[in-house]
Amino acid sequence: LLSVKKELNNFFKNIYVAPGNHDVKLGSTDERKVFLQVFKKNFNSFFFKDNLFFILDTTINPGNITADQLKLIKNELSKKKKLNSIFIITHHVIWENYVKQNVQSAVKKNFFLNNNFGQLKKILLTYKNYKSIIFIAGDVSVTNKTTKLFCEKNENFYYLMTGMGSKNFDNYLKISISEQGKSVSIVPVFF
């Protein structure tokens, strides 16, 4: 992980990582300790041009957002009177059971049965001054059975799934935000 971070530092001033099960496994593990030594935090937030980004950890309590992360979200939302977009970035597709279309992430269907995505969504809905809420997840695995790229809009909520590992339709998302922060463009980059 340290060598990866050093390489990324050549290109980016700030690096925010949503840890996945290949990075830290599930729960409290030795791999998680190494991850925290390298990246210092397992979840974070930042503002960029009146857009608020949350990078969350869904591996410590598998498929869930922990209480300390929910507290961070509430605190950060209370700091701004108006936002253009709110981005929620996770490894696991915690919203898999909340979209209309059928998506297949890398985990079994029952993985998210007891998750607290509804609680997260309720917190976000209490904040009224935003244009859109964009959920991005990347746990599409190395199998060919998973959905490789997905986008669904439901009211002001956007659900995006991206990822790599199978060598078929591997992709990442390029997010561009206008100078004023009001226009957001998200484009898949395939390789």
List each language-model region with its residue ranges.
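Short, solvent-exposed aromatic-acidic interface loops
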Residues: 186-191
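Short, well-ordered beta-to-alpha junction loops that form the rim of enzyme active sites
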Residues: 58, 89-93, 138-140
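Short acidic, glycine-rich surface-loop motifs adjacent to enzyme active sites
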Residues: 80-103
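Extended active-site neighborhood of metal-dependent phosphoesterases/phosphodiesterases
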Residues: 1-81, 85, 107-134, 142-185
